[in-house]
């Protein structure tokens, strides 16, 4: 995980560009399909706030944004550094006939939105890939309304030695 070290942006982008078509399958395998449940829980947390403007950072193939799109009256912006991941996301929303999500290529460390704009910001499995953790989180808080919620979904390396072995 990124512990505020500078990570090579180009390297991260290239990785996600190359795995975009397999990404969802890989998530199914690595989480034993639990990622779908965890992503739905983000939407459940968000619903309590009745948000109108939502930003999904590191949206990838759009799963979290799609779950959030079910919130009545909401408008979702999904951003990611990978054009190929966003192509998969756009294909999904077209097939599902979802029209309240807009995807764009954008770095978490340099968001293209005005200050205090979003009611909710979600980041699923993205914080670890920020090229600069502090800058990425500062940008998130810049565009989040003062009474808004930042919801982060991340995995960690388990402490149980038997399970930990599977992560190495």
How would you label these PLM feature ranges?
Residues 109-120:
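A short acidic, Gly/Pro-enriched loop at the edge of an enzyme's catalytic core
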Residues 149-168:
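Conserved class I S-adenosyl-L-methionine
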Residues 134-146:
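A short glycine-rich, Lys/Arg-flanked "PGG" loop and its adjoining helix->strand segment in the class I
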Residues 1-24:
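N-terminal, positively charged/glycine-rich alpha-helical extensions of SAM-dependent methyltransferases
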Residues 32-52:
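Conserved alpha-helix/loop element of class I SAM-dependent methyltransferases that forms part
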Residues 119-132:
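A short SAM/SAH-binding and catalytic strip from SAM-dependent methyltransferases
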Residues 53-57, 61-110:
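Class I SAM-dependent methyltransferase SAM/SAH-binding core
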Residues 80-81, 132, 155:
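Short beta->alpha hinge that forms the Motif I/post-I loop of the SAM-binding pocket
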């Amino acid at each position: 995980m990124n512990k505020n070290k500078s990570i090579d942006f180009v390297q991260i982008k290239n990785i996600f560009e190359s795995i975009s078509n397999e990404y969802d399958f890989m998530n199914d395998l690595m989480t034993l399909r639990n990622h779908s449940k965890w992503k739905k829980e983000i939407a459940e947390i968000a619903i309590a706030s009745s948000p109108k403007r939502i930003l999904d950072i590191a949206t990838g193939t759009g799963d979290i944004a799609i779950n959030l799109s079910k919130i009545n009256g909401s408008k979702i912006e999904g951003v990611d550094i990978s054009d190929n991941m966003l192509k998969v996301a756009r294909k999904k929303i077209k097939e599902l006939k979802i029209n309240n999500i807009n995807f764009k290529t954008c770095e978490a460390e340099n968001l293209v939105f005005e200050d205090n704009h979003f009611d909710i910001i979600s980041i699923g499995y993205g914080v670890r890939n920020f090229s600069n953790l502090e800058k990425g989180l500062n940008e998130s808080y810049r565009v989040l309304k003062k009474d808004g919620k930042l919801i982060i979904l991340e995995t960690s390396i388990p402490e149980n030695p038997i399970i930990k072995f599977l992560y190495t």
